[in-house]
UniProtKB/Swiss-Prot annotation:
It is an enzyme of class 2 (transferase). Calcium/calmodulin-dependent protein kinase that operates in the calcium-triggered CaMKK-CaMK1 signaling cascade. Required in G1-phase of the cell cycle for proper timing of the initial nuclear division after germination, but not for subsequent mitoses. Required for the normal temporal regulation of nimX activity. Activated by Ca(2+)/calmodulin. Binding of calmodulin results in conformational change that relieves intrasteric autoinhibition and allows phosphorylation of Thr-179 within the activation loop by cmkC. It catalyses: L-seryl-[protein] + ATP = O-phospho-L-seryl-[protein] + ADP + H(+); L-threonyl-[protein] + ATP = O-phospho-L-threonyl-[protein] + ADP + H(+). The modification Phosphothreonine is found at T179. Residues 279-322 are annotated as: Autoinhibitory domain. This is Calcium/calmodulin-dependent protein kinase cmkB. SUPFAM superfamilies: Protein kinase-like (PK-like).
Length: 404
């Protein structure tokens, strides 16, 4: 049973009632672990948030608790909050255990994947978003990583998770939110120009997710951040390369276009989207959508290349965070600096570069926008090689200089 907390009031500090197990996922400020209630033996997922790393951001956690308390038991496609409390060092959000994995990991493990499968998944997302909007809640951070399956079964519920950036708002306050929030590639145009935003930002994100679900890459990938923002601001996208979209129906493309409408007032609402012919066809279109073409081969190729790069990006961000916090502190123990390494062909070998030479190397940067759109197999292998080389050299750049 969750601790009773009034709005704006901190959870009571108390001993942890759960024993944590294997790690299910991790971010910059938190880690999600499997846990078991010490008294009942029931298994859950615990989002463990380091209070020291969240200094100045505590409101995000309080907000997530408030949102989940209000909606988590009212819809089958929203993750259920079971408990919340804090210990001396951590904040805990305990939810039902979603064992089915993330959306795209699950898709890539399937033997086949058709447009009708995508429509079914988007319908479930829309149903949950319509429920949130009916309760005056804007999620503001919808993306594939925040969509989890309840169980590994084929008919498992798809769940919306991570309400840290969500907001509760009255109907007359529909467009008063002005803070920049969310994941840049999934932000709506009105978030960037800070003209005020509300429920339509979730529909924009659903359009992006749908596009991604049909090809394995995102529509606004550009060479620079500025070009990406400009493309989002004008909804400058296309259904290309043609070979990845040849098997996708016009109904699906129209649905995406109506979600990715620049003017939020002209964008579909969640309830309107649920009535779109692609989501709610007038007849059984299972055999018609995309002419029954299996979309999985192209999606796996594009998504796996994108995932390889983003794993490296997450590593860079995590290590940069460790730098900010004064060294390689892991679970309260100073990590021993491993031998520096680099990639020679396909082998990781000891790096004999001197500390002075390493100091003069260029700063490490990885472009987070790349998503392998339309890459050849050779280009993908080259990208993976570069990522491996970058990750292998990370540790040699993170140890305090006094230790080198």
């Amino acid at each position: 049973m969750a601790s009773q907390v009034q709005p704006g009031q901190k959870p009571k500090v108390q001993p942890c009632r759960y024993k944590t197990g294997k790690t299910l996922g991790a971010g910059l400020y938190s880690v999600v672990k499997e846990c078991v209630h010490i008294d009942t033996g029931q298994y859950y997922a615990a989002k463990v948030i380091n209070k020291r790393l969240m200094v100045g951001r505590e409101h995000m956690v309080r907000n997530e608790i408030a949102i989940l308390k209000q909606v988590s038991t009212g819809h089958q496609n929203i993750l259920t909050l079971v408990d919340y409390f804090e210990t001396m060092n951590n904040l805990y959000l305990v939810t039902d255990l979603a064992l089915g994995g993330e959306l795209f990991d699950r898709i890539c493990r399937k033997g086949s994947y058709y447009e009708s499968d995508a429509a079914d998944l988007v319908r479930a997302i829309l149903s949950a978003v319509a429920y949130l909007h009916d309760h005056g809640i804007v999620h503001r951070d919808l993306k594939p990583e925040n969509l989890l399956f309840r169980t590994p079964e084929d008919n498992a519920d798809l769940l919306i998770a991570d309400f840290g950036l969500s907001r509760i708002m009255d109907e007359e306050q529909l467009h008063v939110l002005t803070t920049t929030c969310g994941t840049p590639g999934y932000m709506a145009p009105e978030i960037f120009d800070k003209s005020g935003h509300g429920k339509p930002v979730d529909i924009w994100a659903i359009g992006l997710i749908t596009y991604f679900m049909l090809c394995g890459y995102t529509p606004f990938d550009r060479e620079t951040n500025l070009e990406e923002v400009q493309a989002i601001a004008t909804a400058n996208f296309s259904f290309t390369p043609v070979e990845y979209w040849r098997g996708v129906s016009q109904e699906a493309r129209d649905f995406i276009k109506r979600c990715l409408t620049v003017n939020p007032k002209k964008r579909m609402t969640a309830h309107q989207a649920l009535q779109h012919p692609w989501i709610n066809p007038p007849y059984d279109t299972t055999d018609d959508l995309g002419s029954g073409e299996d979309l999985l081969p192209n999606i796996k190729k594009n998504f796996n290349a994108r995932r390889t790069l983003h794993k490296a990006i997450d590593t860079v961000r995590a290590i940069n965070k460790l730098r900010e916090n004064g060294g390689l502190m892991m679970d309260g123990i100073m990590s021993v600096d491993p031998k520096p390494e680099h990639v020679n062909g396909s082998e990781v070998v000891e790096d004999r570069t001197t500390p002075r030479e390493r100091e003069n190397e260029d700063a490490m940067e990885i472009d987070s926008r790349s998503n392998a759109r339309g890459q050849t197999e050779q280009q993908i292998r080259e990208q993976e090689r570069k990522v491996k080389e970058t990750v292998a050299g990370l540790w040699s750049r993170t140890a305090p200089r006094s230790e080198r």
